[in-house]
Amino acid sequence: MIHNQEVNGDLQSRGIRFIMDTDGRQLIPWEEIQSDDVVIIPAFGTTIEIENLLLDKGVEVQKYNTTCPFVEKVWNRAHKLGGDKYTVVIHGKPRHEETRATFSHSARSAPAIIVRDMEDAIRVGEFILGNASRGTFLEQFKEKLSPGFDPDKDLERVGVVNQTTMLATETQAIADYFKDVMLRKYGAGNIKAHFADTRDTLCYATNDNQDATYQLLETDADLAVVVGGYNSSNTSHIVELCERKFPTYFINSDSEIKSSEEIHHFDYPNKRKLVTRDFLPEKTPVRIVLTSGASCPDTLVDRVMLRLLDFFPAARPVESLMQEW
């Protein structure tokens, strides 16, 4: 449903079964899905192809549709971009469920291309400016283009949207880059005919979370603990930000904190679990940054906070602190 093992595990314990895994691999064959089954569309949304498949089976797809409204906002903007004859540039991870869904919905009304990062954006920009061949471009983006995509004509007018859990600063930097490319090719007087301003599609929940993390980076903390699903895109970006300044421990629940001397945590870049001992400094007071991904339940963050407080007997009771707020 979301990229959080605790939430998904709870759902499974209540009898929910997942049709696909997070990489789109089939867990339950479509042939097993019947018209009287309840199919819940997750927060990421789903592709038009899957929606149509379910509709053909007589499955109700709207009654249990939990697609995030900010994801739907991106789809609506992509539809408008297509109506205005712009190509939709999607900043996202090509295999992520949300990006696959956004790509499907965008391609319904506009040419669409996925760029993973600024390096991908620069490759597109180099083609637009005439510095890369058509063959090279098509090879680099062969699995990231909508059917029939023609780079010679489909990159004359572009608008950038994103997988809503990507770093907002990165999406904005990519949009700014494409605007600069169009300025260089077509001139300031023609920019509106070649570049659409789409900054209002950024998800405020993810953006607020990231902005709050930037503020935490201004503190003099001793370490950071980030709580969230290990396959959560938005949580991984929070971890990435915290690692710029603090020793950072990425955990999915309070159970990963084994004692005041041992913590089990996730090394996201290398996709492996690590065990760190003596993670708490031998000093007082200890300053800990505690934050989480947007998909992490507040109750889980509370449990982590209380677990950490267990190691500091002199700490003020949470109840008395809450009264001040």
Range-by-range predicted roles:
Residues 1-325:
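The feature marks the mature, well-folded catalytic cores of soluble enzymes
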